[in-house]
């Protein structure tokens, strides 16, 4: 988080209304100067100072500091419903063997019918195109969760470079035989600022392209698909769950 106090205030209010309270709320301050860190501290959050610019490094610092068995991540502009944390926990508790990531959709806070239409194109397009590159569904950083034990393994290969698309890069760490569950119950509303045609939009595309190049150097898309299909064929019919 960097200089996002107004959005953070709304998120903290939503987290305070959760039916299943969090063990802790960690806010990573990535060099803010607008009072965001002070706002988080006043709300009882654990604030980590991470002055080095970059989402991937800041996110990893938060994951490393987490004490709970389940790490749940969202963005400052996310607006989770009261049952959001409970839904993440339920998805892991009742998921198929090998579930390492749970994620869901995001809906832009726009007037109807634009909210549904634009969200379906933007978020749906991202999920489908990235799934083709990964050979499974990707994590959507606006609402995602993972067991801490899995992060301890994934952190050794996940990048902390400011040039990567962090949740896409994390998704590349999912191995054959591991699962990503996509659940509507963990979906959140979010700011439409990602739709702006500005420098931020260009930067996101550059990060995505860099992340694909970085990971495809290690494993080509068809190699990922082949390995995943081979792993799936060994699971048996009893595990044919359409989670990605």
What positions do the PLM features span?
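Short, acidic, metal-binding catalytic loop of nucleotide-sugar glycosyltransferases
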Residues: 14-22
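Conserved donor NDP-sugar-binding/catalytic core segment of glycosyltransferases
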Residues: 83-114
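A conserved acidic beta->alpha catalytic loop
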Residues: 3, 29-37, 78
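Short beta-strand-to-loop acidic/aromatic patch adjacent to the donor-nucleotide binding site
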Residues: 68-79
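Glycine-rich, basic loop-to-helix element that forms the pyrophosphate-binding segment
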Residues: 50-66
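Acidic helix N-cap motif at the loop->helix transition within catalytic regions
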Residues: 6-10, 34-42, 83
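Short, flexible, basic/aromatic active-site loop/helix in glycosyltransferases
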Residues: 103-110, 115-137
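Acidic donor-binding loop at a coil-to-helix junction in glycosyltransferase catalytic cores
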Residues: 162-170
